[in-house]
Amino acid sequence: HLSNTFGAANGFGLKITSGANGGAASGHIGFYQPDGTNDGMISGSGGTITYGAFTGNHPASLPDGVDEYAYGTVMAITGTSSDSNSPKAVIYEVAPTTAADNQAVLGVYSNDAGFQLDDKDQHNIFAIGDGHILVCNGNGDIAVGDYISSSAVTGHGQKQADNIMRSITIAKATQAVSWSDESGTTKLISCTYHTG
């Protein structure tokens, strides 16, 4: 908890100064795993703050009786409500997509968020940034840069039929798939997320 007790209008709640003057990029805040592996950094240079790497998510509840889904599962909104403690916050209810080009898609399942809202376990649904998505061979091979929309295979995306970002667009592929080179018809690939 940070609190600014300085009464002036130009007081800071938190001020971080690092590095030397002169415009060179400075790493202000670093995020690390217990083993020292770097997860990301907030840095600045010449008046621009940079967040890298990042992935934005929305917390969401799953259908009753479901504990989790596979990482990369494509999830659609099935309902919304408000948190009784934070009435401006939206609580999403989600389930895996089951039809092609579902415009109710919220993002891609990541993991259990480790907290509850209104007595429902919350799970992280990736919506912007980068990560992975489960895809199938619907609409054919996937090239780097192809948009991904939902498919008829439960919880899987497929190559979108065109290259225009639409309400059905979930992601953009950053990994190519030639299905004739694969042993199956589904795969987890890297992507950037575009559902926001």
Model regions and ranges:
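Extracellular receptor-binding modules and their adjoining Ser/Thr/Gly/Asp/Asn-rich linkers
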Residues: 1-196
